Amino acid sequence: MHGVNDPPLFIKDIKAGLKNLNVVFIVLEIGRVTKTKDGHEVRSCKVADRTGSITISVWDEIGGLIQTGDIIRLTRGYASMWKGCLTLYTGRGGELQKIGEFCMVYSEVPNFSEPNPDYRGQQNRVVQNEQKDKMNTSIFGTVGNGVQTGPESRGYPLQYGRSNGPGPISPQLPGEPSNQTVRTTISNARDPRRAFKR
């Protein structure tokens, strides 16, 4: 966390979740206005300092006052991920103060608001793990006291999933000979009926 009197933070040091940020930047581009459901105007502006660039989201009338080339000091801002991109916001009690025009050393690269594949990968892994957890949770399994329920609890191994051949998957009862032949299918996961035609 940074206080109001702390020296400005460089854009390269901004991370999602940081609050009370003080940043000095030059406005490079002003995006088109979008309106929220409740009537607020939002502009996304590309801003930069000497360490790189980032997108700042500016709300309502203040967004209409900002112009390309303005040098601005943001106080009490915060950073967050929006649609996989690091974005800067003014926050509650945050201020944007114009302190100059045009004369500032800056670099457009790296753009820290570019979609972050590492972040997207982390989000995808989280979603996949949640889906896996939901799939593993079924009406069978262990009860809170550790007792196994379902067909497995009676000593019958039950196969879940798809079979490799026609017909249903049926449990093999203990002591019975297997009447199913095991077929191994190798697939590249493409449906041959949907082959690309040139």
UniProtKB/Swiss-Prot annotation:
Residues in the DNA-binding region annotation: 26-89
Compartments it resides in: Nucleus
Membrane-crossing segments per the record: none
A single MF term (Gene Ontology): RNA binding
GO cellular component: chromosome, telomeric region; nucleus; site of double-strand break; SOSS complex
Main location: nucleus
InterPro entries, per the entry: NA-bd_OB-fold, SOSS-B
Residue spans of biased composition, Polar residues class: 142-151, 177-188
SUPFAM superfamilies: Nucleic acid-binding proteins
Region of interest (Disordered), ranges: 142-198
GO biological process, one term: DNA repair
Subunit structure: Component of the SOSS complex, composed of SOSS-B (SOSS-B1/NABP2 or SOSS-B2/NABP1), SOSS-A/INTS3 and SOSS-C/INIP. SOSS complexes containing SOSS-B1/NABP2 are more abundant than complexes containing SOSS-B2/NABP1.
Family: Belongs to the SOSS-B family. SOSS-B2 subfamily.
Name the UniProt record assigns to this protein: SOSS complex subunit B2
Species this chain originates from: Rattus norvegicus
Gene, per the UniProt record: Nabp1
